[in-house]
Amino acid sequence: MSVLVKEVIEKLRLDIVYGEPELLEKEINTADITRPGLEMTGYFDYYTPERIQLLGMKEWSYLISMPSNSRYEVLKKMFLPETPAVIVARGLVVPEEMLKAARECKIAILTSRAATSRLSGELSSYLDSRLAERTSVHGVLMDIYGMGVLIQGDSGIGKSETGLELVKRGHRLVADDRVDIFAKDEITLWGEPAEILKHLIEIRGVGIIDVMSLYGASAVKDSSQVQLAVYLENYDTHKTFDRLGNNAEELEVSGVAIPRIRIPVKTGRNISVVIEAAAMNYRAKEMGFDATRLFDERLTSLIARNEVQNA
């Protein structure tokens, strides 16, 4: 998986100072970024030319302080064929020697008015998400009250129908049938649709529905953090389901675990409302309000009072 230089330009709204069309088609294969400070002093032992080179005020100031011929020579060493692009932050003026070296070495020179630290963070975050390894899972990913909920279950259980009902209730569809999930960092999962399935949902007996066309742009979302997993399964009288919410399960994807709850599907149950309640209950727990703990405390208090009265 790779990202093209032109995609970075479009995402971060960079300005092109120098860049022939073919240079903007160069591939970026690493999310790491280099700020070439030591390299400008002539130390290239651990130089990583395959990364995007980002110059901020410090690097630019040192470069400008150098004699013109020295500036050109050090830039010639930095600009190698495998270098995707060079970005100059803060809207700083690109020296003529840099343009000359870029033309000779065929390297795109880009600029941004953003502060270096902010630009570095945005660039790293974008490349991390684009280059992260994807894991495809079967299910429906919904944005419910701003929280990403992954709905899974056996084939034919009604995942897509539940997703459509949630859309009608004002929530947003992220992905149906196939959800591509990646770890944005060590504790966060994100999900997005396959490009071919974007904004589409399949309903048995009806066919494929374009959710954006039918319900508007507010009914869809391109990606979402995955915070809760819901597993739908047929109701079985011989199986015990969690009734208090104290039997925690987890779903692990790409080394990151998220909580998962199991919801029994039975005639007459409004599953979309149950999932809404599950999402709100999870958010309440994250904010420190735990209904299960409150029930336990009330039950313990009631038992204690009864013991005193019966003593």
Swiss-Prot record:
Designated gene of the protein: hprK
Entry function: Catalyzes the ATP- as well as the pyrophosphate-dependent phosphorylation of a specific serine residue in HPr, a phosphocarrier protein of the phosphoenolpyruvate-dependent sugar phosphotransferase system (PTS). HprK/P also catalyzes the pyrophosphate-producing, inorganic phosphate-dependent dephosphorylation (phosphorolysis) of seryl-phosphorylated HPr (P-Ser-HPr).
Protein name, per record: HPr kinase/phosphorylase
Subunit and partners: Homohexamer.
Family statement: Belongs to the HPrK/P family.
UniProt: Mg(2+) binding residues: 160, 202
Taxonomic source organism: Streptococcus pneumoniae (strain ATCC 700669 / Spain 23F-1)
Keyword vocabulary terms for this entry: ATP-binding, Carbohydrate metabolism, Kinase, Magnesium, Metal-binding, Multifunctional enzyme, Nucleotide-binding, Serine/threonine-protein kinase, Transferase
Pfam families: Hpr_kinase_C, Hpr_kinase_N
Sites where the protein binds ATP: 153-160
